[in-house]
Amino acid sequence: MSSLSAGPVLVLGGARSGKSSFSERLVEASGFTMHYVATGRAWDDEMRERIDHHRTRRGEGWTTHEEPLDLVGILRRIDDPSHVVLIDCLTLWVTNLMLEERDMTAEFAALVAYLPEARARLVFVSNEVGLGIVPENRMAREFRDHAGRLHQIVAEKSAEVYFVAAGLPLKMKG
């Protein structure tokens, strides 16, 4: 595994692709103080189990921050050049923003504007949802479109981009 880039890193993949595990290994190998920003909400028992599984897998040595909406705010609060921050995941953040009827363009612009200011190393995890069929309902299509746009703008600003499938990372940029 290579050393962690100074610029943002984006790790994309499908559900259960191994993207979170790969990202955690990348962060753990960095030698920086590890922070984890969880954007998911425990809406039900199944989601609580997923969150618990991720927390158990990470083990000790991580400081966890739960922030479903104010991603830039939490990143600013924990920004330090000795930190590496794993944000898992952007697609759950998009879901939360949509459910709260936030201005997606403004939220995405705020995140992208923050990236050059960040002193901590940032590793973003996100689900690639644009590889399947066109969703049949409007909300699902809007979600797919928002996620796709966010991935493109974060990838453009990232030093490294990976796509993970079957637990195997493919380096796409950097």
Swiss-Prot record:
Recorded superkingdom: Bacteria
UniProt keyword annotation of ATP-binding present: yes
Source species of the chain: Sinorhizobium sp
Protein function: Catalyzes ATP-dependent phosphorylation of adenosylcobinamide and addition of GMP to adenosylcobinamide phosphate.
Active-site residues annotated for this sequence: H54 (gmp-histidine intermediate)
CDD domains: CobU (cd00544)
Organism taxonomic ancestry: Bacteria, Pseudomonadati, Pseudomonadota, Alphaproteobacteria, Hyphomicrobiales
InterPro entries linked to this entry: CobU/CobP, P-loop_NTPase
Matches recorded under Pfam families: CobU (PF02283)
Catalytic activity: adenosylcob(III)inamide + GTP = adenosylcob(III)inamide phosphate + GDP + H(+); adenosylcob(III)inamide + ATP = adenosylcob(III)inamide phosphate + ADP + H(+); adenosylcob(III)inamide phosphate + GTP + H(+) = adenosylcob(III)inamide-GDP + diphosphate
GO molecular function: adenosylcobinamide kinase activity; ATP binding; cobinamide phosphate guanylyltransferase activity; GTP binding
Pathway(s) where this gene product acts: Cofactor biosynthesis; adenosylcobalamin biosynthesis; adenosylcobalamin from cob(II)yrinate a,c-diamide: step 5/7; Cofactor biosynthesis; adenosylcobalamin biosynthesis; adenosylcobalamin from cob(II)yrinate a,c-diamide: step 6/7
Signal peptide start-end: none
EC number from the UniProt entry: 2.7.1.156, 2.7.7.62
Top class in the EC scheme: transferase
Assembly, per entry: Homodimer.
Family the UniProt entry places it in: Belongs to the CobU/CobP family.
Record keywords: ATP-binding, Cobalamin biosynthesis, GTP-binding, Kinase, Nucleotide-binding, Transferase
Gene3D superfamilies: P-loop containing nucleotide triphosphate hydrolases
PANTHER family: BIFUNCTIONAL ADENOSYLCOBALAMIN BIOSYNTHESIS PROTEIN COBU (PTHR34848:SF1), PTHR34848
Protein known as: Bifunctional adenosylcobalamin biosynthesis protein CobP
Disulfide cysteine pairs (residue numbers): none
Biological processes annotated in GO: cobalamin biosynthetic process
Binding site for GTP: 13-20, 38-40, 55-58, 66, 88
